[in-house]
Amino acid sequence: MSLLKNEVDILRRVPLFSGVDAPKLKLLAFTSQVVRYRAQETLFAQGDAGDSAYVILSGKARVFANTDNGPIELAEVGETDFVGEIAILCDVPRTATVVASTNLATLRVGKDAFFNLVTQFPQVGVGIMSELAHRLHQTTLNLTDLSSKLRQLEMEGGRA
């Protein structure tokens, strides 16, 4: 199987790209770059400029946010997952650090190719909004849980 066909097959399985026809996926794969990482290598770091997003072709990576108390793991991502889109959508520095936890193959999708795809296929934009809304919901649940635990600790310590 050719590398381009393999990339298109993987892109077809990415939920965000499910409604995109094969010729457009082939063009996206052709205009993107396969980048390989070894375990423990960093794809990008929190605070870096965001000029691309990545589709995980194979392997796994961990997503971390840096805090004053050290890094916090936010998620583990694997084949067909998409990372790095927030920085290019919002034109902000990277909001997290992504580190390969195994040998990793990615498809690096540049900002222009990404926006061309979203322009031509609005359902991709809707899919991205849905994924971001899901992540925000999960973050809100986590924040609520942590806030509740903090309040409980304060009450137990007599500081509330």
Task: Identify the meaning behind each predicted range.
Residues 1-160:
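Cytosolic regulatory regions built on CNB/CRP/Popeye-like sensor folds
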